[in-house]
From Swiss-Prot:
Entry-linked HAMAP family: GMP_synthase
Protein name: GMP synthase [glutamine-hydrolyzing]
Catalytic activity: XMP + L-glutamine + ATP + H2O = GMP + L-glutamate + AMP + diphosphate + 2 H(+)
Domain Glutamine amidotransferase type-1 residue range list: 13-204
Pathway: Purine metabolism; GMP biosynthesis; GMP from XMP (L-Gln route): step 1/1
Residue ranges the record marks as coiled coil: none
Species annotation: Prochlorococcus marinus (strain MIT 9313)
Binding site for ATP: S232, G233, G234, V235, D236, S237, S238
Length: 528
């Protein structure tokens, strides 16, 4: 999302220039938490483009490069003449120093990673209410050796003399740590200082404001034409259904494609919920065998995602011809979906991505090139927590608002092998046990996602004095705020024991349960 058209008509108060950091969008989320709208754009964005956007502040993100490297990503040097306050974070600070006449070098023997106490020397402006000795998250192998003219030191750590710097006259600020991550204890205070006290922003990015703008944007985009919604029953598509119903009424047709990869009992729950409780008409399409046959012999996860995405569109196209005509396809694509599917930062000199592509999202990377619909994606500028707020404001019940995220390709990407009915039934039963036990323990709403994964191997076991040779199930439970980063959930041992015992005793074809204790990064939440 690097252009104002895809973001609607609202102009960003804060622009984040992305230099390839996996935390760039987290910066945007932290700014939005202050009720100020922010937009992530490529580091290639020109000073002229920024002048037209007229943001009140600019944040330069971190990144994996060194500013002195031959192909280091650089921002337009004319940005420094715009008269707009700038905050550089990690690489962004080093770039600011380098371009304004300072010097950055490799931190030989003194690279700093992880938590470090910040010693505040100047508590004005940026560091107001940031306590000296507070913990900040460091992640850098380079350090500033010489500050540019006009800059002063604001704070230091044990290994970083210039951990925070400023040119107060020009309102240029830099920090060598990451205030956006949860590990930085006073990071939010620092961001608020920059957004409110330095940039003078107003708190007008609210749920009510978004709903009003989104409705107006959809009405302007769609006009009197009809929209087909790909409804899955999760919080994203359900919120989208409520939003579109409010915006365009009977111009909306919801369609649920049962591709055979849903969790146990979900198709029935979905149809009852929308039809009986909220009287939103949903067309049910049973396409289970069609999807499973398309995945025959397919193991590669990227190929699975693209096949499922393509087949979804094909089914929608066929059904739209029967029910239509429809001009638009609505999707519950969110900001993290777009982020994980493509790096927006392409070096114009080398053609190389600065940010590494993680995996294609089924709503983004899986779309066929000959798509017959125009897309309506009013949620694509929101993070998951923002979607939940919108859903609540629109009247969506908590049982939907607080449901755990579920991938569009469903259980097909939780079977790390060829997909067939036997494996699907096995995984459905195991997954149901996981969710039942976590709900019974009162932990469901404390966990971001909890699910089972079926591995493509078999292990030896003994049951009833007989040798077994069956599949292992992986238990994956993570805690997160927005899905951008995640930590594995520390479940009570007694709960883990109950889950394991039930799965090996109740699920046919399984004789072993293992626990995934990998955080994101380095892993992703889903296995495929």
């Amino acid at each position: 999302m690097s252009n104002s058209q895809s973001e609607g008509k609202r102009q960003p108060a804060i622009v984040i220039l992305d230099f390839g950091s996996q935390y760039s969008e987290l910066i945007a989320r932290r700014v939005r938490e202050t009720e100020v709208y922010s937009l992530v754009m490529s580091y290639c964005t020109s000073a002229d483009e920024l002048r037209q956007l007229a943001p009140k502040g600019i944040i330069l993100s971190g990144g994996p490069s060194s500013v002195y490297a031959e192909r280091a990503p650089l921002c337009d040097p004319n940005i420094w003449d715009l008269g707009i306050p700038v905050l550089g974070v990690c690489y962004g600070m080093q770039l600011m120093v380098q371009q304004l006449g300072g010097r950055v070098e490799a931190a030989i023997g003194k690279a700093e990673y992880g938590k470090a106490p910040l010693q505040v020397e100047d508590p004005r402006d940026l560091l107001t209410n940031v306590e000296s000795g507070s913990t900040m998250w460091m992640s850098h192998g380079d350090v500033v050796r010489d500050l540019p003219e006009g800059f002063v030191r604001l704070a230091h750590t044990a290994n970083t003399p210039d951990a925070a710097v400023a040119d107060h006259n020009r309102q240029f600020y830099g920090v060598q740590f990451h205030p956006e991550v949860v590990h930085s204890s006073h990071g939010i205070a620092l961001i608020r200082n920059f957004v409110y006290h330095i940039c003078g922003c107003e708190p007008n990015w609210t749920t009510t404001a978004f709903i009003e703008e989104a409705i107006a944007q959809v009405q302007a985009q769609v006009g009197q034409k009809r929209v087909l919604l790909a409804l899955s029953g999760g919080v994203d598509s359900s919120t989208l259904a409520f939003l579109l119903k409010k915006a365009i009424g009977d111009q909306l047709t919801c369609m649920f494609i049962d591709q055979g990869f849903m969790r146990k009992g979900e198709p029935e729950f979905l149809m009852d919920f929308f039809d009986q409780k909220f009287h939103i008409n949903v067309e049910y399409i049973n396409a289970r065998q069609r999807f499973i046959s398309k995945l025959k012999g397919i193991i590669d996860p990227e190929e699975k995602r693209k096949i499922i995405g393509t087949e979804f569109i094909r089914v929608f196209e066929e059904e739209s011809n029967r029910l239509g005509p429809f001009d638009y396809l609505a999707q519950g694509t969110l900001y993290p979906d777009v982020i994980e599917s493509s790096g927006t930062n392409i070096d114009p000199k080398t053609g190389e991505r600065v940010a590494v592509k993680i995996k294609s999202h089924h709503n983004v990377g899986g779309l066929p090139k000959d798509l017959q619909f125009k897309l309506v994606e009013p949620l694509r500028r929101l993070f998951k927590d923002e979607v939940r707020k919108v859903g609540r404001a629109l009247g969506l019940p908590e049982e939907i608002v607080r449901r755990h995220p579920f991938p569009g390709p469903g259980l097909a990407i939780r079977i790390l092998d060829e997909v067939n009915d036997e494996k699907l039934n096995c995984l459905r039963d195991a997954d149901l046990i996981v969710r039942e036990e976590i709900r019974e323990a009162g932990l469901y709403h404390e966990i971001w996602q909890a699910f089972a994964v079926l591995l493509p191997v078999r292990s030896v076991g003994v049951m009833g004095d007989k040798r077994t040779y069956a599949w292992p199930i992986v238990l994956r439970c993570v805690s997160s705020e927005d899905g951008m980063t995640a930590d594995w959930s520390r479940l009570p041992h007694e709960l883990l024991e109950r889950i394991s015992n039930r799965i090996v005793n109740e699920v046919r074809g399984v004789n072993r349960v293992v626990l995934d204790i990998t955080s994101k990064p380095p892993g992703t939440i889903e296995w495929e």
